Curated annotation (Swiss-Prot):
Single Gene Ontology MF annotation: protein serine/threonine kinase activity
PANTHER family per the UniProt record, alphabetical: MITOGEN-ACTIVATED PROTEIN KINASE KINASE KINASE 20-RELATED, SERINE_THREONINE-PROTEIN KINASE YBDM-RELATED
Entries under PROSITE patterns matching the protein: PROTEIN_KINASE_ATP, PROTEIN_KINASE_DOM, PROTEIN_KINASE_ST
Job of this protein: Together with the serine/threonine kinase Pkn1, may play a role in the specific interactions with host proteins during intracellular growth.
Residue numbers annotated as active site: 138 (proton acceptor)
Enzyme class: transferase
Pfam families reported in the protein's UniProt record: Pkinase
Catalytic activity: L-seryl-[protein] + ATP = O-phospho-L-seryl-[protein] + ADP + H(+); L-threonyl-[protein] + ATP = O-phospho-L-threonyl-[protein] + ADP + H(+)
Species: Chlamydia muridarum (strain MoPn / Nigg)
Record-listed ATP binding positions: 10-18, 33
Protein's name according to its UniProt entry: Serine/threonine-protein kinase PknD
Protein kinase domain location: 4-296
Amino acid sequence: MQRYELIRLIGRGGMGEVYLAHDKACSRRVALKKIREDLSDNPLLRKRFLREAKIAADLIHPGIVPVYSICSDGESVYYTMPYIEGFSLKHLLKSVWQKEILSKELEEKTSVKAFLPIFDKICATVEYIHSKGVLHRDLKPDNILLGLFGEVVIVDWGAAIFKHAKELQQEKDEEGFSSYGQKNICYSSMTVPGKIVGTPDYMAPESLLGAEASEKTDIYALGLILYQMLTLSFPYRRKKGRKLPYEDSILSPIEMAPYREIPPSLSQIAMKAIAVDPVQRFSSVQELRKALQPHLQGESEWTTRDILSTKDRKNWKYYEPILLSRYFPVLASSPAQWYNFMLSDMEVNSSVRVECSVTKSSVQEGVGIFFPPSKEADKGEFYCGYGLWFSSQNNELSVSLIKNGIEIQKESQGIIPQQSRFAISIEKSNNKITVFVDQILFILHIDYLPSLGERIEIIIQDLQGISNITILESIGALRVSCLAVPDAFLAEKLYDQAARFYRKIRDSFPGRKESYEAQFRLGVTLLTQIEEQGGDLMQALSTFDLLHGSTGAPLEYLGKALVYQRNGSFVEEIRSLLLALKRYPQHPEIPRLKDHLCFRLYDSLHKHRSEALVFMLLILWIAPEKIGLREEERFLEFLHHRQQSTLFCRIDKTPLQFKSSKMELFLSFWTGFTLFLPELFQRARDLRDYQALIDIFYVVCASGNKEVFSQFAEDLAIFVDEVVFPKSLHNQRGEELVLFVQGLAALQNREYRQAKEFISAVPFALQLYALDLFSLQAFIDEEVKVFSDFLQDIYNSASAEDHKHVLVYMIQVSLWNQDLKQAYELLSKNFPQDKGLIEYSEAFVLWGCYLALTGDRSAVKAHFSRCQFKYGRSALIGKCIDDDSLDYLEGLVWWEKKKTLFQSYFLLRCLHAPKERYEVYRQAYISMENSFFG
């Protein structure tokens, strides 16, 4: 085990112990599980321990921790896995057991609604292992790990085995498995080596009586877990070792915990899963999951209303060829394209799901599915309302969201070249449009204006390329809402009539959902009316104020966020959403806010890309489960050039994973959104994650938040006195981290002599962090001589290999000192222009500054005009040559804006611009607040 350094014990089980360890070869933290020393001489248990590792290694699923390595040489028997930050389900349940009063936070975390998605993920993992022929045989809260980023993983595969394997009989023979009579069943909470496999408390009755394990024994354990989630208690209460006769009845979850508001059907699901007779249980985990679906996240139950055949004219009011460019010019690639056009005779309500499949060839030509309002469609205005256009080119599928004939959103993803058909699902409900292709989310759009009855419209060239179309309606939507009348007025833009009816409903149903929903829609009505007819949008805020403290309180902040969004007050919009999420994290309306966050993310990617980073951070922190693997890949690609421009990403070579603490820190750095830094600091400190702590202090310093920096520094000093940091490949330890932080504090206080003493005592990588932070401060404060000496000391003590990392700062000093010769030599030798410079790189900007120093203003303008990305940071820096308005900087994210101001100031100094010109940029840089909110 020389490769691994054990940091601390995480947990202990029946056979093994799990440690947090440092992998020296890969410079990463891992979880290392080794067989207990008191059991290491038992050949049967060694065999079972290795079988556990091999089974886990063969299973690939998000709910199963992958195995990195397995070692069985000599006395050492262990295997390693990724370390997942989090806690066990048992830990969460134990925190509320036998407590009469719970804190609000704990009550929300352990609510039925909060537990159901967790249970579904557990079931999904068990369904997967059953499909691979594996039985876990020891499912219990102890073996369920809840990660900080929404992960739900099953651990401890010591009892796992393949169904019908020979080992089942061998275990009985070798372990002396004896058949227990009904009256002799005892219960404990731990796997008993040498007797029975599994934890008796969670074993099905037939297993305790000696029957072989099966899928239904795992289902029984799942049922017990669900029972505990619903009731926060175990179904039977017996002292350890006490017999439990089967004649004792088990109370249903509703009877056990009547205060928990458990739906009767959910209670029945739990009781069916723990039925004594295996025949009465669910036949499979898939069946169990299917029964749960209507309860998950308030998901609507759908019923098939009709199936429309594209070949049967009776289903369609209009069924004729059209010239695509006549109605949808934005979609037509050729003015002479003719398509089959079909408009349904039936009318669908506002909650509808449309399902069909289309061939690859038809998508290459383009397929449209639209929802025109019946009133407009009957007048031949087929382009009105919402619609989707599906097209593909070069193995890329694109989905465009069309509103009133205008494309408002477009998303594209790669497809498998051999794929011949695509399954499409479009759902319109609760003011939300979601579009899935082959179960992958393409479009999420929210419109708070209600829609009236609509028809289904299909546009396709070849009718053979589309299947029959299934129309499903929400069961809840089949009931006519009292809000339907004012919704109809609002859809017709009859704002005064709509407002009058919304007020009536609000006053008629005090304390009920209809009341607060009517008040929210009243606010949307007034906001829309002001936006269309002119006026102060902020007047609508008072309408949403009336929701304060009501049963629909989160909608107050959602409504205000809508006002601020339309008013262009982005910071206030974010503040409103955060208040709702902080005050009401488990409120039934919070999923609505999470959906809104997702919509704003996708919408900002399409319209305001700088805002997207903030929404990305919020979703990563609050609702990471909303982001799928395909979206993760897309977002990582979107962030790639910023990653290349971030110092701590270049120094720390650990890959930037989307759902990680490092990504949260990365987004905090770029957005200036430091609200989550205290939690990130505490997490890194508890994990003794040296590199993460360095990065956090760098980000805090870059933000300029001295108060947070001081608090973190005090906490770190106390912590380092109490613990020992693990060695890394660079022998970096806690003492060096303290020196580094003291050096940064000295730089902040302009105590340069002390700063030099502290920073000179730390490794070069840490010196580079300090150098980068000092460079911004030194040039803005015009203390370049001190910085130059600091830089020279670091350069002299660094290795030849490390010299390349400080070249940018040396060039900056040369340019500031107007040393054209040295600046040119450094630039041409290390960043030759003929090799092609990346336009968002520091070197590209420094070449522009060099040209400015030569006095050739036209050459400088030509240099920056070469930028392909006209709204990229480098292109915007060039605008300062002729424009001092700073308005063009508003589209930049916080750190981009700050860096652009600095580099524009530096460029103007090189251009020998009048002081009053470059002082505008200097003061703008200084005046930037030290955080997102200011």
